[in-house]
């Protein structure tokens, strides 16, 4: 496995792979890797001749500087895991390598067709501009055939599909396939997340109520309206000491707009467990 720190070296290595006709699978990450990431990487390794993983905590997608500073980082540990999984290349640049100071100062602009106006986009202004900025740059460097994203970040996944398939950038990504990968959960049911590292053992036990409530809502949805289930989920989670719902939206999986119909519905939740912000979702 080769660890690459510069765009120039990455482009050189990827060009060699393309010349050799090898299929390239790509998994973009921000590090602090866990079994959820590992499942994406295993799939990428199995389905492609070359597997590339990026490890980069992207500053342009954080609208909270404290959150950026607290985001867990351990490249040595991450690299050991990726080597064991059979990854060929790890791209681990610095922010200065990825962006000029001018790019850091300027607001990246993109037409999201309204996908960024709800949920995470509403709560974290500018977040998805940063996501598209870094993912498009990584795609341009890696030129993958397949790119793997987890469904836990459901809104992000919808926006990446839009970027590749329907946006003004689509022509750049002809032949690129976005692979949706299911949420990986701990034995307790808690959705795996790098942010879980910031939870105490007691907080992890408390946070299990998030997924338990979402799974229970599948039964509630059989006899109740969307609005009734939405309110019941919020009330149930908020009743747990130590948890506070930021939002729970039941949306159409394609448009991300709130829906009153169970067809194509996805429930997306963000909950604070102490100071740690956790997300999860469930398909109805």
Q: What would you call each of these model-derived segments?
A:
Residues 2-242, 251, 255, 275, ...:
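Nucleotidyltransferase catalytic core that binds NTPs
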Residues 248:
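Substrate/ligand-engaging "lid" and interaction regions
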Residues 259-265:
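A short, glycine/Asx- and small/polar-enriched loop/turn
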